[in-house]
Each structure stands twice: as structure tokens, then as C-alpha cells.
């Protein structure tokens, strides 16, 4: 039976929760190379709730160091791929300072490994991920327009450097296939320990929504499927309705059935948690809608002219070239080309894009 720790926490006393996580999931880290991967979607301030909070990263780095790790590497591959974006993302989020000189740009060195040929025969994975003796994942408690939630499994998408993430979005072609692809990426290097920042969560059109909610908890587990099941339940969702959890169970990576999970601590269940449009219970249960989603997008990006600064970031990062500059220098999406990958929404620095 998988276990998930649910511990009350604030950013001021988060070290206590980290210590508790290592008590429940002990690890011999003496002399080992330890990779710590926060969720760094893009450049964002800590108070925006988009990235893993620096207080959690700092506490984990200090704990791992106290356990005698031989080498500590802190890194991620954010969605933005321009030169210097990795460093900028860590600096602005406060994670560079929290990493305590352990930061490394993981995107500069990678190796090709075999992958699911239905998408691509090989993919590049950051060498620091493949070479780590122990892999700690630090996801954020958030919703996601494409995958409904972004938790333990989705955080592993960041082991892929550069534009490979965008290429896989294009190769998937539909939300349902992307759910399945996520599990294939996750299997390339399964985290040994997951500690989730659920002190402040995100709802609505995540993973870069303006809607934040106080959760006041830190979650931990050595099984990502179990953790994402608990996160789904906390958001008021049936975890068995999420395709990526279904596939993960089929692949023997864990069980999302709440009866197979031992929760150490009290689960907070929110009956009014704001779920993205594609993630609503009505859509999940509606086979006709799901069939349409599998073949053609129901939602396309809409840009708020009052918020947009015409930076063209969304246009540059669209993997299928579905966005172009329209009238009044406001980007417009071609619904025939759009594959609903949500990259534009994720990477918009002004949060000016919604899927409608």
C-alpha cells in the first residue's frame, strides 16, 4: 500500500514538514549525487504561485546536505527556451538563492534515450537526471488546462531540455494522447521522493492562473500515482477519471484507488475548487465531448487586449505555428492549427491568454 504524507505547513515553518517527510521516507544519501527538481514553469515571482516556493527548496537542500550527500544539483527545464531563460526563471522566482550554489542549468547537457515510437523513437533527457543516484521532485499543487492537475507526474515533463517538450506536444496532437505521453516521459526516470508545495495552491486555468487558494499543507510520497490521486481528491475530482492516472496504473506504476493509499494526515477536500474547462466533471464523464477532444480542439487561445503587451512570446513558442499577430498587435490563434497544448497560456508573462 502506497503512503502519502499530508502535513500542515506554512512557508515560515516548512522545514518541519520536510523533516517529517524524510522520517516517513528515509533515504541513505551519504556520498550520493542528489538531484532536486522544483517546478519552474517560467519567469515568475514567488507570490504568483506559479513555481515551487523557494522556502520549500531551501529546506530540502539544507536537509539533503545534512544527510551527507556527495553532490547536490538543483535544476529544471522551464518551458521557455531562449538563451538565458533558465537562469532568469530561477533568479526571479527566488529559487536561485534558495538553491544555495547548487543550481545548474540542466539544459546544457543531455543524452538521447529510447522512447515510445508512437511519438518519437528517442528523446533527449538532461544528463543530471539520468546520472542522479537519488531524484527528489518538488511539484506545485496546481490545476492545468490540459491535464486537469499538474502534480507529481506532470512535474517530470521538465526532465526534457529545450524544444523537445514542444515537439512532443505536437507529436501527441490531442489532449488525451498527451496524457498518455506524460506517463512515458515520467517512466524515463521515476523520482525516488516527491515533496509537494501545497501551502498555496492554484485553481482555475492553471498552470499560470491568477486564482490562488490557501491550502496550508505539504504532501510527500515515494509514489507519484498515489500523490496525484490524493491531489485530485483534494480538488474534488475522481482520480480514476484522469487518463494519465489510468495509464500509470495500467503500466504498474501505482494505484489511484483511494482504498489502496494510506494517508498520513488529514485530507482537505474542496467542493468548490475551480477546475479548468477541459477538466470539469461533466466533460470527463461525457464520451461525446471526449471524442471531440481527441480529434479536434474545443478551446482556442483568446488574448486579452488590455493585458497583452505584444511581446510575441506566445507566437515564438507555439509548436505548430498556430498563432500570428493580428490587428492592433494582438496575437490571434488559428483554430484549424491549434492542438490545445496550452504552451501559449503557460508562457505568457502577462497572464493575458485564456482558453475559450
What are these regions (language model features)?
Residues 1-305, 309, 315-320, 324-330, ...:
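N-terminal and secondary-structure boundary signal
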Residues 310-314, 341-344:
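Cysteine-cluster motifs in flexible loop/terminal segments that predominantly coordinate metals
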Residues 306, 336-337:
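Short, contiguous acidic/charged loop-to-helix segments that flank catalytic cores in large enzymes
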Residues 338-355:
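Short Fe-S-cluster ligation motifs
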Amino acid at each position: 500500500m502506497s503512503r502519502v504524507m499530508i502535513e500542515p505547513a506554512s512557508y515560515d515553518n516548512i522545514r518541519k514538514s520536510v523533516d517529517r517527510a524524510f522520517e516517513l521516507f528515509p533515504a541513505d544519501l551519504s556520498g550520493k549525487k542528489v538531484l532536486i527538481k522544483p517546478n519552474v514553469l517560467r519567469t515568475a515571482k514567488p507570490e504568483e504561485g506559479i513555481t515551487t516556493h523557494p522556502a520549500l527548496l531551501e529546506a530540502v537542500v539544507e536537509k539533503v546536505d545534512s544527510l551527507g550527500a556527495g553532490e547536490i544539483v538543483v535544476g529544471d527545464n522551464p518551458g521557455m527556451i531562449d538563451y538565458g531563460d533558465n537562469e532568469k526563471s530561477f533568479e526571479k522566482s527566488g529559487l536561485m538563492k534558495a538553491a544555495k550554489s547548487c543550481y545548474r542549468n540542466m539544459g546544457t547537457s543531455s543524452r538521447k534515450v529510447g522512447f515510445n515510437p508512437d511519438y518519437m523513437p528517442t528523446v533527449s533527457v538532461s544528463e543530471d537526471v539520468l546520472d542522479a543516484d537519488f531524484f527528489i521532485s518538488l511539484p506545485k499543487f496546481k490545476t492545468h488546462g490540459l491535464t486537469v492537475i499538474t502534480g507529481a507526474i506532470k512535474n517530470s515533463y521538465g526532465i526534457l531540455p529545450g524544444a523537445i517538450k514542444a515537439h512532443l506536444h505536437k507529436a501527441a496532437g490531442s489532449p488525451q494522447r498527451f496524457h498518455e505521453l506524460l506517463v512515458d516521459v515520467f517512466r524515463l526516470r521515476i523520482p525516488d521522493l516527491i515533496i509537494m508545495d501545497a501551502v498555496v495552491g492554484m485553481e482555475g486555468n492553471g498552470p499560470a492562473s491568477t486564482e490562488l487558494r490557501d491550502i496550508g499543507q505539504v504532501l510527500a510520497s515515494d509514489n507519484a500515482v498515489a500523490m496525484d490521486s490524493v491531489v485530485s481528491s483534494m480538488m474534488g475530482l475522481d482520480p480514476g477519471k484522469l487518463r494519465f492516472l489510468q495509464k500509470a496504473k495500467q503500466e504498474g506504476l501505482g494505484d489511484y484507488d483511494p482504498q489502496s493509499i494510506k494517508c498520513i494526515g488529514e485530507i482537505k477536500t474542496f467542493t468548490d475548487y475551480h477546475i479548468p474547462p477541459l477538466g470539469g466533471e461533466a466533460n470527463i464523464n461525457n464520451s461525446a465531448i471526449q471524442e471531440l477532444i481527441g480529434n479536434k480542439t474545443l478551446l482556442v487561445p483568446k488574448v486579452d487586449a488590455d493585458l497583452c503587451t505584444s511581446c510575441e512570446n506566445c507566437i515564438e513558442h507555439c509548436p505548430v505555428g498556430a498563432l500570428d499577430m493580428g490587428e492592433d498587435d494582438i496575437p490571434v490563434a488559428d483554430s484549424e492549427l491549434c492542438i490545445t497544448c496550452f504552451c501559449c497560456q503557460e508562457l505568457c508573462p502577462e497572464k493575458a491568454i485564456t482558453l475559450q
